[in-house]
From Swiss-Prot:
Pfam families, sorted: RuBisCO_large, RuBisCO_large_N
Descriptive protein name: Ribulose bisphosphate carboxylase large chain
Subcellular location: Plastid, Chloroplast
Organism, scientific name: Spirogyra maxima
EC id: 4.1.1.39
Cofactor note as given: Binds 1 Mg(2+) ion per subunit.
């Protein structure tokens, strides 16, 4: 026997395959304040015990592999391994379990959402022993969150920048999302902004297409912003989408927006990637730009109840990576979103400290230790009749974004925006007077119609429009 073989044998190395649970299932483990904690919803294959499945998740997302390797003896597995420390069955679901996994902080690069996700939601999601796997929540300890810059500015600084307080902000996505020339696009922006809007927005897939190159769009939109500001005396903005095919091109677009003096730009953070998003967020803080985030591709990742990543995790990741706004669903519009679940991740975006609350899908207490908050953006199939519910659900620190609910007004863009602004002001005033918007909302809107023909026309157009479908992703 060679000396090397003798050394390995003496160290206790034995080739072969061991059950994961012998090493990675540790129900006696007491979690540390510095651990990153994860809650996985797992569906094991028939015949796979939940303890083995949970241990496999912990192993494959940290230090483990499918067989014993002699190089395990060159490190300290007890220090670096992930641990499945608890498993509970999912009520009302057959063969589904919540596996709780603790990860030592040293497994992750500081300030990198990319590295965090590569480990925790990497190869393990294709593991054959699992029929399905979903990451429901993460607990990010202060020791890790403090390594991130977070949002470029946060909503408190944003309010100071645009000098608007005491109400939700109003936005509008320009429609049709594709096909307008740059000049006509700028015209639509101007009509909306002069009518009472705070922001207008590029849609997520508006980048630099043959019918409208990005530089032309930026120029005509900047002209529209300055003209609307001069007429209204209010600070206005448009989310100029800087998303591009390369990071270098993305930064070029951000720099041009800064040169034009506009207040805010935009990024598609999931399709663009976390590395690109974090780089852009750093640029925005250094150069005084607000950053609006669109979540295009989110439903591909989070809509199925038993597999993928829940949006509350993607929301936490965005807060660390950086963004001042992010689309969060509406509860009442055309997009998926159950009320309590939505309010749970809205609080995770905005608040400093959020208590564990399983009724809202929050599996862990989260302390952001003064990281700036992100404004949730309610967007997708909303119109003036939704305004009372949106005001009550999201409160002042939010952006209410009407696309078709502005541009679909029978009298045009500016009257559409007037209708939304009047409806919002009426709801905020009624709330401040102590009225119950959940019960009296429709009456508040009807009263406001007496003073605004634009609102009355909008109410008539959309009085029958509802999106009443069962929510797929429930607790």
């Amino acid at each position: 026997m060679s000396p090397q073989t003798e050394t390995k044998a003496g160290a206790g190395f034995k080739a072969g395959v061991k059950d994961y649970r012998l090493t990675y299932y540790t129900p006696e483990y007491e979690t540390k304040e510095t651990d990153i904690l994860a809650a996985f919803r797992m569906t094991p294959q028939p015949g796979v015990p939940p303890e083995e499945a949970g241990a496999a998740v912990a192993a494959e997302s940290s230090t483990g592999t499918w067989t014993t390797v002699w190089t395990d003896g060159l490190t300290s597995l007890d220090r670096y391994k992930g641990r499945c420390y608890d498993i509970e069955p999912v009520a009302g679901e057959e063969n589904q379990y919540i596996a709780y996994v603790a990860y030592p902080l040293d497994l992750f690069e500081e300030g990198s959402v990319t590295n965090l996700f590569t480990s925790i939601v990497g190869n393990v999601f294709g593991f054959k022993a699992l029929r399905a796997l979903r990451l429901e929540d993460l607990r990010i300890p202060p020791a890790y969150s403090k390594t991130f810059q977070g949002p470029p500015h946060g909503y408190q600084v944003e309010r100071d920048k645009i000098n608007k307080y005491g109400r939700p902000l109003l936005g509008c996505t320009i429609k049709p999302k594709l096909g307008l020339s740059a000049k006509n696009y700028g015209r639509a922006v101007y009509e909306c902004l002069r009518g009472g809007l705070d922001f207008t927005k590029d849609d997520e897939n508006v980048n630099s297409q043959p019918f409208m190159r990005w530089r032309d769009r930026f120029l005509f939109v900047a002209e529209a912003i300055y003209k609307a500001q001069a007429e209204t005396g209010e600070i206005k903005g448009h989310y100029l989408n800087a998303t591009a095919g390369t990071c270098e091109e993305m930064m070029k677009r951000a720099e041009y927006a800064k040169e034009l003096g506009v207040p805010i730009i935009m990024h598609d953070y999931l399709t663009g990637g976390f590395t690109a998003n974090t780089s852009l967020a750093h640029y925005c803080r250094d150069n005084g730009l607000l950053l609006h985030i669109h979540r295009a591709m989110q439903a591909v990742i989070d809509r199925q109840k038993n597999h993928g990543i829940h949006f509350r995790v993607l929301a936490k990741a965005l807060r660390m990576s950086g963004g001042d706004h992010i689309h969060s669903g509406t509860v009442v519009g055309k997009l998926e979103g159950e009320r309590q679940v939505t309010l749970g991740f809205v609080d995770l975006l905005r608040d400093d400290y959020i208590e564990k609350d399983r009724s809202r899908g929050i599996y862990f207490t989260q302390d952001w230790v003064s990281m700036p908050g992100v404004l949730p953006v309610a967007s997708g199939g909303i119109h003036v009749w939704h305004m009372p519910a949106l005001t009550e659900i999201f409160g002042d620190d939010s952006v209410l974004q009407f696309g078709g609910g502005t541009l679909g007004h029978p009298w045009g863009n500016a009257p559409g925006r007037v209708a939304n602004r009047v409806a919002l002001e009426a709801c905020v005033q009624a709330r401040n007077e102590g009225r119950d918007l959940a019960r009296e909302g429709n009456e508040v809107i009807r009263e406001a119609c007496k003073w605004s023909p634009e609102l009355a026309a909008a109410c008539e157009v959309w009085k029958e429009i509802k999106f009443e479908f069962d929510t797929i992703d429930t607790l």
